[in-house]
């Protein structure tokens, strides 16, 4: 996949902190999530209580990290940021937990990747605001209970199915983020252009939005590249011609597909007669890992209606045939 279209963070996402919304009012899209979060925040503030623990689930690039920072901002408290993979030992987690002040937000990205020992230490911390740590080794080792300040855990995950039931059940607020509409992405792009001090035409913003795979991170990334083209051609505003020139350089078509996306669909059509084809067989034909294919490449193709999963395997849809200008087979069930 093109580095410009991956929803994961890349080096092309540096220097965009100033584009992030600082409050729920500035945050575009995810209306249901915002309503639930706004209610919980307002109630906690009115009662003078610590906010319930929050789980933010959804595909990468949809604003989970931004929402975590907004939660801390709305509560006017400190945020401590870490991620599941870096918390290797219980001591790593204990050091963070004992440094928290009342009402602080602890944000753990990729919380589904916590190892079991660290996760188990977290249970008593988020439920009773206490932790038990072992002092010493061998027969003389003893457990000491330490009280910690009440805090709010905000966990983010792209794979909520990998969360253990005991951990998931300890979150009082579970929010599922979904892909954005073209209309919402257009507003995000126009806001970003304004903050970058660049004028953009409405049609140009919509053109970028349609190629952004329902993901704000991609929309911002593409907008930055379009701004580069604007600078090079010495124009005074972003119009559709400038967007098209940029997308041609990036090899991104009008449906937001890049070269490898098209290769996936063409492989199924040309080698497997449109499918069905099993994940492992398709991955072998493409020379990629099966997990990479299912977790990185497939979500957008499924969401956009180019690919479908059946009990027998993957099939391409009529939309894919038409987009790639293949003749649609007769008597084919899609």
Curated annotation (Swiss-Prot):
Keywords: ATP-binding, Cytoplasm, DNA damage, DNA recombination, DNA repair, DNA-binding, Hydrolase, Nucleotide-binding. ADP binds at residues 19-20, 27-28, 61-66, 180, 216-217. DNA binds at residues 309, 314. GO terms for cellular component: cytoplasm; Holliday junction resolvase complex. One of its GO terms (biological process) is DNA repair. It catalyses: ATP + H2O = ADP + phosphate + H(+). It is found in: Cytoplasm. The RuvA-RuvB-RuvC complex processes Holliday junction (HJ) DNA during genetic recombination and DNA repair, while the RuvA-RuvB complex plays an important role in the rescue of blocked DNA replication forks via replication fork reversal (RFR). RuvA specifically binds to HJ cruciform DNA, conferring on it an open structure. The RuvB hexamer acts as an ATP-dependent pump, pulling dsDNA into and through the RuvAB complex. RuvB forms 2 homohexamers on either side of HJ DNA bound by 1 or 2 RuvA tetramers; 4 subunits per hexamer contact DNA at a time. Promotes Holliday junction (HJ) branch migration in conjunction with RuvA. Subunits can be free, ADP- or ATP-bound; nucleotide binding changes during the reaction cycle. Has a DNA-dependent ATPase activity; dsDNA and supercoiled DNA but not ssDNA stimulate activity. Homohexamer. Forms an RuvA(8)-RuvB(12)-Holliday junction (HJ) complex. HJ DNA is sandwiched between 2 RuvA tetramers; dsDNA enters through RuvA and exits via RuvB. An RuvB hexamer assembles on each DNA strand where it exits the tetramer. Each RuvB hexamer is contacted by two RuvA subunits (via domain III) on 2 adjacent RuvB subunits; this complex drives branch migration. In the full resolvosome a probable DNA-RuvA(4)-RuvB(12)-RuvC(2) complex forms which resolves the HJ. Has 3 domains, the large (RuvB-L) and small ATPase (RuvB-S) domains and the C-terminal head (RuvB-H) domain. The head domain binds DNA, while the ATPase domains jointly bind ATP, ADP or are empty depending on the state of the subunit in the translocation cycle. During a single DNA translocation step the structure of each domain remains the same, but their relative positions change. Belongs to the RuvB family. HAMAP family: DNA_HJ_migration_RuvB. This is Holliday junction branch migration complex subunit RuvB. The lineage of its organism: Bacteria, Thermotogati, Thermotogota, Thermotogae, Thermotogales. The gene is ruvB.
């Amino acid at each position: 996949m093109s580095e410009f279209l991956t929803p994961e963070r890349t080096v092309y996402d540096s220097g965009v902190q100033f584009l992030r919304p600082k409050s729920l009012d500035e945050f575009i899209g995810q209306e249901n999530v915002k309503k639930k979060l706004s209610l919980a925040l307002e109630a906690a503030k009115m009662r003078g209580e610590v906010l319930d623990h929050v789980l933010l689930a959804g595909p990468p690039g949809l604003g989970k990290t931004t929402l975590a920072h907004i939660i801390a901002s709305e509560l006017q408290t400190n945020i401590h940021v870490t991620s599941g993979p870096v918390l290797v030992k219980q001591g790593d987690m204990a050091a963070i937990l004992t440094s928290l002040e009342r009402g602080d937000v602890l944000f753990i990205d990729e919380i589904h990747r916590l190892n079991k020992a660290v996760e188990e230490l977290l249970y008593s911390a988020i439920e009773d605001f206490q932790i038990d740590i072992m002092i010493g080794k061998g027969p003389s080792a003893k457990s000491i209970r330490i009280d910690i300040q009440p805090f709010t855990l905000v966990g983010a995950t792209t794979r909520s199915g990998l969360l253990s039931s005991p951990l998931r059940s300890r979150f009082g607020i579970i929010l599922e983020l979904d892909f954005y509409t073209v209309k919402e992405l257009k507003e995000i792009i126009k806001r970003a252009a304004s903050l970058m001090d660049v004028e953009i035409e409405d049609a140009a913003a919509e053109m970028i939005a349609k190629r952004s795979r329902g993901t704000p991170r991609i929309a911002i990334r593409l907008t930055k590249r379009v701004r580069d083209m604007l600078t090079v051609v010495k124009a005074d505003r972003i119009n559709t011609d400038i967007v098209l020139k940029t997308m041609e350089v990036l090899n991104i078509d009008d449906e937001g597909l890049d070269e490898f996306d098209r290769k996936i669909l063409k492989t199924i059509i040309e080698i497997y007669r449109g499918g069905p084809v099993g994940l492992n067989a398709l991955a072998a034909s493409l020379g990629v890992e099966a997990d990479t294919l299912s977790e990185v490449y497939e979500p957008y193709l499924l969401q956009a209606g180019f690919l479908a999963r059946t009990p027998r395997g993957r099939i391409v849809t009529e939309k894919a045939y038409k987009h790639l200008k293949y003749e649609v087979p007769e008597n084919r069930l899609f």
